C-alpha cells in the first residue's frame, strides 16, 4: 500500500491532455498560461492578479482554425478545478458552448472540451497506463 507521498508522486507524473474548440484565434500558436485561480462564493473559479489562489499551468497548441473558432490541444501541468475554462476565458478565448465562462456561441449544443489523453504510472504495479480518445468530429468540423 502506498502512503500519501507515493500517491502524490504518481499524481505529479501523470499527463492530462485535452482538446477544446475556443472562440476566435489566439495570438500565439503555442503558449504557456501561468496564473493563479481562486473560487468565489458562487463556486465560480477565476484568474486573479493579486497573488492569491493556487497556481495553475496550462500549455496550449493551436491545431487548426477558421479564425471564428480554433481547435487547441491543452496539456495540464497542474490540475485545478475549471482550470482550462478559467484560463481560456482570461486570454479572451472562452471555450465554445461555455456560457458560464464567457462564451457567446454554442455550435455543438454542449461545452466543446474533451479529454484526449491520460497517462500515469499505476501506483501498485508501476506500469505505465495510457488512455487515448479520438478528437470528436464536431470539433474538427467547427474549426475547419
Predicted regions, residues:
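Pseudouridine synthases involved in rRNA/tRNA modification
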Residues: 51-54, 67, 77, 85-144
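Glycine- and acidic-residue-rich catalytic/RNA-contacting loop of pseudouridine synthases
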Residues: 9, 21-70, 86, 130, ...
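Conserved, well-folded catalytic cores of nucleic-acid-processing
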Residues: 12, 40, 91-94
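Non-cytosolic beta-sheet module surface loops
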Residues: 24, 76-78
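SH3/SH3-like beta-barrel fold
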Residues: 72-74
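Single conserved hydrophobic/aromatic residue that forms the stacking wall/gate
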Residues: 1-11
Amino acid at each position: 500500500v502506498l502512503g500519501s507521498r507515493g500517491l502524490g508522486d504518481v499524481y505529479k507524473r501523470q499527463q492530462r491532455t485535452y482538446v477544446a474548440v475556443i472562440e476566435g484565434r489566439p495570438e500565439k500558436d503555442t503558449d504557456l498560461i501561468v496564473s493563479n485561480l481562486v473560487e468565489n462564493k458562487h463556486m465560480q473559479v477565476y484568474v486573479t492578479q493579486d497573488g492569491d489562489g493556487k497556481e495553475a499551468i496550462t500549455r496550449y497548441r493551436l491545431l487548426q482554425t477558421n479564425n471564428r473558432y480554433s481547435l487547441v490541444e491543452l496539456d495540464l501541468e497542474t490540475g485545478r478545478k475549471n482550470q482550462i475554462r478559467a484560463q481560456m476565458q482570461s486570454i479572451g478565448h472562452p471555450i465554445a458552448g461555455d456560457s458560464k465562462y464567457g462564451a457567446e456561441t454554442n455550435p455543438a449544443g454542449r461545452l466543446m472540451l474533451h479529454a484526449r489523453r491520460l497517462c500515469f504510472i499505476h501506483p501498485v504495479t508501476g506500469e505505465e497506463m495510457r488512455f487515448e480518445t479520438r478528437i470528436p468530429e464536431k470539433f474538427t468540423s467547427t474549426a475547419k
